[in-house]
């Protein structure tokens, strides 16, 4: 697991209070991990802070799964 992936997963576990084993690449923040829209916004803000990136709102709307978050951040950090 990449450093980015492990940091993303740690943020999700911390913010959503879910078990680390539930945070798999294909897990949806809302459908699988129980996040509501406010939780999702807070996750995006935490990703921005942790990785020192900006995620525009139109892009944030496309980040619905753990894997999508990891991919977006890996691309943004290149």
UniProtKB/Swiss-Prot annotation:
Keyword Lipid biosynthesis among record annotations: yes
Main location: cytoplasm
Start and end residues of each Carrier domain: 2-77
Domain of life: Bacteria
Cell location: Cytoplasm
GO terms of molecular function: acyl binding; acyl carrier activity
Posttranslational modification: 4'-phosphopantetheine is transferred from CoA to a specific serine of apo-ACP by AcpS. This modification is essential for activity because fatty acids are bound in thioester linkage to the sulfhydryl of the prosthetic group.
Keywords: Cytoplasm, Fatty acid biosynthesis, Fatty acid metabolism, Lipid biosynthesis, Lipid metabolism, Phosphopantetheine, Phosphoprotein
GO biological process per UniProt: lipid A biosynthetic process
HAMAP family named in the record: Acyl_carrier
Role summary: Carrier of the growing fatty acid chain in fatty acid biosynthesis.
The protein's name: Acyl carrier protein
Taxonomic source organism: Flavobacterium johnsoniae (strain ATCC 17061 / DSM 2064 / JCM 8514 / BCRC 14874 / CCUG 350202 / NBRC 14942 / NCIMB 11054 / UW101) (Cytophaga johnsonae)
Organismal lineage: Bacteria, Pseudomonadati, Bacteroidota, Flavobacteriia, Flavobacteriales
């Amino acid at each position: 697991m990449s450093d980015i992936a492990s940091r993303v997963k740690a943020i999700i576990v911390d913010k959503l209070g879910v078990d680390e084993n539930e945070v798999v690449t294909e897990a949806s923040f809302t459908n699988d991990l129980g996040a509501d829209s406010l939780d999702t916004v807070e996750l995006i803000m935490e990703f921005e802070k942790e990785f020192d990136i900006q995620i525009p709102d139109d892009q944030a709307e496309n980040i619905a799964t753990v894997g999508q978050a990891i991919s977006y951040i890996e691309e943004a950090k290149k």
